[in-house]
Every structure is written in C-alpha cells, then in structure tokens.
C-alpha cells in the first residue's frame, strides 16, 4: 500500500508538474504571440507612416508641378496678351489721320531737340511728311531704311535717336508693364 501511495503521490506530482509546465509553456506562447502581434502592429504603423509621408511628398511634388505649369501657362498668356496689345497699338497709330500721325512725330522730334542730321525711315513707314520734317528740323532723307513698322531714326554724328513705332511702343509697354500685369491679373 505504501508503494501505491508513493506511486499515486508521484503520479499527482507528475500531473501537477505537467500542468505547471503546460501553463508555463502556454504563458510563454501567449507572451510570444502578444510580442509578435505588438511588433506586427508597430511595423504596420511604421508602414502607414512611411506610406503617408511618401504620398505627401508625391502630392507636394505634383502640386509644385501643377503650380509651375499653371504659372508658365499664365506667363505665356500674359506675354501673348501684351504682344497683342502692342500690335493693336501699332495698328491704331498707323490708322491715324496723316495730320495726327505727323503731329505725334513732330512732338517726339521737338522733345528730342533735334536740329540737323539724317532721317532714316522705317521699312513700314509710308505716312510721314518727309519734306515737312526735313525743312522744319534741318534733316536730310537717308537712302536706306531701318527695320520697323513705322517711324524713323535720326542720326547725327555719333548720336542715334530711335523713333520707330516699334521702339516707342516697346518702351511704353515696358514703362507700364507693372500696371499692365495688374490689369491682366484682375488686380486693378
């Protein structure tokens, strides 16, 4: 009987030890699973963060590209509009009556205080009263023509005064470019 009790006691101790080991292994397994789940969640969160940063960078790059494209197109349209304004202004000046047209050039020449020299007409010039300018300002008509849609150049010694329509319109636009840009952008 004593042997049976010893065997029974050993069996009980064995069951207790097995149960303790099972619980210990179960706890280790649960801890391992919890640790791995936590690592997985941290990895997922890091991947989300990386993806979000990557998307933000791509979005920022795309927005920058779109802004650049928009600003380039806007600048192109503004430049095209300014060129159209220049052409329209040139056409309006050329369509003035001969009296008004010559009066404009009289004003420019008087402003420059020209006395003497050579008047060289622009290739596109066909309305200037050359005789009037030659007599009034002591000018001599040059044989050649300069590039331009109208007007002329006065040359005396080393001095050249460019009074072509192209130059005058260009200077007028350049002088007022800020105001023109504000009008084009609807700021005025």
Swiss-Prot record:
GO biological process per UniProt: proton motive force-driven plasma membrane ATP synthesis
GO molecular function, one term: ATP binding
Highest rank taxon of the organism: Bacteria
Cellular component terms per the entry's GO annotation: proton-transporting two-sector ATPase complex, catalytic domain
Residue spans crossing the bilayer: none
Family assignment from sequence similarity: Belongs to the V-ATPase E subunit family.
HAMAP family in UniProt: ATP_synth_E_arch
Protein name: V-type proton ATPase subunit E
Organism (species): Dictyoglomus turgidum (strain DSM 6724 / Z-1310)
Lineage, uppermost ranks: Bacteria, Pseudomonadati, Dictyoglomota, Dictyoglomia, Dictyoglomales
């Amino acid at each position: 009987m004593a042997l049976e009790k010893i065997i029974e006691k050993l069996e009980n101790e064995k069951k207790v030890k097995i149960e303790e080991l099972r619980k210990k292994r179960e706890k280790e397994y649960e801890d391992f699973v919890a640790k791995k789940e936590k690592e997985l969640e941290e990895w997922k969160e890091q991947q989300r963060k990386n993806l979000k940063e990557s998307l933000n960078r791509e979005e920022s790059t795309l927005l920058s590209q779109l802004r650049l494209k928009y600003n380039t197109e806007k600048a192109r349209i503004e430049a095209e509009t300014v060129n159209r304004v220049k052409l329209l202004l040139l056409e309006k000046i050329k369509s003035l009556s001969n009296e008004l047209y010559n009066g404009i050039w009289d004003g420019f020449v008087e402003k420059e205080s020209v006395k003497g020299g050579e008047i060289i007409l622009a290739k596109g010039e066909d309305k200037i009263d050359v005789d009037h300018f030659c007599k009034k300002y002591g000018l001599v008509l040059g044989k050649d023509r300069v590039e331009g849609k109208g007007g002329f150049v006065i040359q005396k010694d080393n001095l050249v005064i460019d009074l072509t329509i192209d130059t005058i319109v260009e200077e007028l636009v350049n002088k007022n470019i800020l105001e023109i840009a504000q009008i084009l952008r609807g700021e005025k």
